[in-house]
Amino acid sequence: MTIEEQAGLVKLASPKLAGTTGELRDQALLAVAKALMDNKDAIFDVNKQDMEQAEKDGIAAPVLKRLKFDEGKLRDVINGIHDLVQMPDPLFQTKLARELDEGLTLYRETCPIGVIGVIFEARPDALVQISALCIKSGNCVILKGGSEATKSNKILFDTIYAAVREAGLPENCMLQLEARSEINELLTCQSSVDLLIPRGSNAFVQYIMSHTNIPVMGHADGICHIYVDKDADIGKAIPIILDAKTQYVSACNTVETLLVHKDIAKELVPKLAQVLKEKHVELRGTKEIQALVDCVPATEKDDDTEYLDYILSAKIVESVDEAIDHINRHGSHHTDSIVTENKETALHFMRMVDSAGVYQNCSTRFADGYRYGFGAEVGISTSKLHARGPVGLEGLLSYKYKLFGDGHIVDDYAQGRKKFHFVDLP
């Protein structure tokens, strides 16, 4: 069976899944959580095989960190599933109720997008999170994970699919692609797939966007910035920078570039450099930074690089506006933070920086669906259409209009025999 034919079966399952009750979908999620726990030893063994092969292949350390699926990550994904179960059913929610005329009533109601194709990096925990979000939101899903995690993804998918089927969700509500070559086939399935969410490098995401007619939602690079203003509290700034750089270095919301106001640089940079050195972070600085501390010289390329590694580039700026201009020019519109005690400066920064997330006095690592209280996320979108920032349940929903009448016809209004009165209902 071709990928197009398999995707067609998923499309046929879409209205069946959309019509299920929230109670049934929650039961399916609980079944998934139980199945993952029951099969954890086998899952860990298979993941160990992927890890060993990746190490033999010389895979970079950040990728290895994402690839690992251990007790901690299992606990996190199961907690995320339980959080989703506690959330109200996102479907069939009335967002607008309006009486257009007597006996003619309009409702806008939430519904699933339909079939979502997600192409993601070698992160087994992402497969679980994405699957759970799609189950909760009533969306069928087609999954393609990174090749380094092939065995881990297969056992996780098989475990999840068996659990949801046993719980009563429709056949073909989920599909897993395993071969890299199948990605290009998926890109041609515009009659079956309603939305693609690619996660990966900038080059990969751009490739997906330019080779499909399916709508694409997502982000490419995660070039996040922290700007330390002249009115910053250094006691806050250093822990924030350290957390944003080292808490999970291979994440897309990790800070890559530090901008420091000239008036605070002499006090901040030497202290920060010492702490970064202790954490084995390589500091790359401009000439002005090099004049304050011993560090690796930065190049223009560093302004546009997502390291996903223990590297931080740093630059001194004259003003908050120079910082804003730098971020808007070199950033990826993902997440950027200002450290300052000046409320007006912070608000100016947050208004002018064109990113999905703009923060004051906190780490960029908060850009995450779970930390936003979304339960989990399917990815982070830097698009300004439909969904922006961490994409949780709400970002996986569309809506439909339901109009209830009693023999109403448009010609009565066109000829003036009747008039609309447009009354919003509670």
Q: Across the structure, where does each feature detected by a protein language model lie?
A:
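Rossmann-like NAD(P) dinucleotide-binding subdomain of oxidoreductase/dehydrogenase enzymes
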Residues: 86, 95-231, 235
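Flexible, glycine/charged-enriched surface loops at secondary-structure junctions
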Residues: 20-26, 91, 167-174, 247-254, ...
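C-terminal core of ALDH-fold dehydrogenases
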Residues: 27, 325-426
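A structural signal for short, well-ordered beta-strand elements
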Residues: 18-19, 230, 316, 339
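ALDH superfamily catalytic-core signature
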Residues: 9, 121-125, 129-140, 155, ...
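N-terminal Rossmann-like NAD(P)+-binding subdomain of aldehyde/semialdehyde dehydrogenases
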Residues: 1-106, 133
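Aldehyde/semialdehyde dehydrogenase
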Residues: 41, 180-207, 250-358, 415-426
